[in-house]
Amino acid sequence: MSREWVNSTAYISTNLGNIVATLADLDAPTTVGNFISLANEDFYDNMKWHRIVDDFVIQTGDPNSRDNNPYNDGTGGSTETIPLEISENLTHLDGALGMARSSDPDSASSQFYICDGEQHGLDGNYAVYGFVVEGMDVVRAIASVEVYGNRRPLLSQHPVEDVWLYDVEVEEGYWNETESTGPTEPVVPGGVLGGGPGGGGGLLVAVAVIVLVGLIAYWKVPKARLLVNKVLRRR
């Protein structure tokens, strides 16, 4: 019996399309566990992507984004925080999912971001816990929406038009167990008994059987013995 871990999969639904991400259950168990718990509680339903920086990150997960006050977006979170979880196997590649936090390394709760391009300057300081496997075109579309910029300095990274996170659903990971199969019997060229190309071994056995039958007939059956002697005398 062999076992192989199948990672959890997150399905992130937005008004600009769907994003599918694989989660790093084994390398970031605390962070992934927190994310899955929130998703299963429908915590992420009907939020907004409140921070958008093209060629950097798109960010969501703040329950304050549900109200009509954009100035408090980015200040909220869930009731519990988790410690910073860093793995050398997880870096800020294009499409990486990471946990947003304050200046306190252990302050991450519910807000998360998706990288728009590689952002290795964040490595070691922010927890990566998954990677987009489908829907990077949606990530790019969100990253390219219009933001307020210099028109509203306090909302410079906030989109002018709302971009919605409808919900997050997770198919949780599991151990896949399969039966181990032993080595199969080798197929020998030339038939069951082998003998190389052309089946020479099988032919020799057939000749031996015919000779044996002939000998038995020779000694056991008088008429056959006489016939054989007659043939031999003619030769």
Residue ranges, per PLM feature:
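Cyclophilin-like peptidyl-prolyl cis-trans isomerases
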Residues: 1-235
